[in-house]
């Protein structure tokens, strides 16, 4: 049976892709056929191969099962803004059925599929659909990425509560050091351990620029996911 997870974050730019790549690496090391899925991505660049998003490309590189870019990222937008805004501007609606079909295709090939969201938990995909709505429909277990900085405790508690209210399992969380650790870093982590009702899968240290290029799977312990 395919293991399926959804990665969300406490905010945008908290390192969801860094954590997702680490998860894919760690699962591959456990012997799984892995694939990462970025169904919706904004902030992309035109290349000789067409519009490409750096986060989706990172997931593609870190998947053990080769996939064409279109399978990894069915909705790609150039402007780095909320998906519901840019999709409306371009007249290209985001269809939940397309997201689900893409997920089914990957699940048929891999035994460990990780879907990475965009922005935070309630990121709108249209005037009537949020990413949270789709995840709830798919009944995906959730992994929360916390960008460790001032304010992250409140954001983590709010997101964990929202996941719980959606009736979805929060199966783990990852602390991602998105800046050099400050004086209160240890206290932030200690508090997060107390207030997030899920096991800590690991802490990814501050790696400077281009952290998605690093071998980050070593920082994670997936045994709580194996037991779930």
List each model region and its residues.
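N-terminal phosphate/diphosphate-binding loop that engages ATP/GTP or pyrophosphate donors
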Residues: 4, 18-93, 97, 102-105
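Hydrophobic anchor at the beta1->P-loop junction of P-loop NTPases
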Residues: 7
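Conserved glycine(s) of the Walker
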Residues: 14-15
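Short internal beta-strands
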Residues: 38, 143-146, 171-177
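Switch II (G3) loop of P-loop NTPases
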Residues: 99, 103-127
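Inter-motif core of Ras-like GTPase G domains
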Residues: 126-149
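C-terminal lobe/tail of nucleotide-utilizing enzymes
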Residues: 160-228
């Amino acid at each position: 049976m395919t293991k399926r997870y959804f990665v969300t974050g406490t905010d945008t730019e908290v390192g969801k892709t860094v954590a997702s790549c680490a998860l894919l690496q760690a699962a591959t090391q456990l012997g799984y056929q892995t694939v990462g899925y970025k169904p919706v991505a904004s902030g992309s660049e035109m290349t000789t191969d067409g519009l490409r998003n750096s986060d989706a490309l990172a997931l593609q590189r870190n998947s053990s099962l080769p996939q064409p870019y279109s399978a990894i990222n069915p909705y790609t937008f150039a402007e780095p803004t909320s998906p519901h805004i840019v999709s409306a501007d371009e007249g290209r609606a985001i269809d939940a059925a397309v997201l689900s079909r893409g997920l089914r295709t990957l699940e048929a090939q891999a035994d460990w599929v990780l879907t990475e969201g965009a922005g935070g938990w309630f990121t709108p995909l249209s005037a009537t659909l949020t990413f949270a709505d789709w995840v709830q429909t798919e009944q995906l277990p959730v992994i929360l990425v916390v960008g460790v900085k001032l304010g992250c405790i409140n954001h983590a508690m709010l997101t964990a509560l929202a996941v719980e209210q959606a009736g979805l399992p929060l199966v783990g969380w990852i602390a991602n050091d998105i800046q050099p650790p400050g004086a209160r870093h240890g206290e932030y982590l200690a508090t997060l351990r107390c207030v997030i009702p899920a096991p800590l899968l690991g802490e990814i240290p501050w790696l400077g620029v281009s952290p998605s290029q690093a071998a980050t799977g070593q920082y994670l312990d997936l045994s709580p996911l194996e037991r779930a």
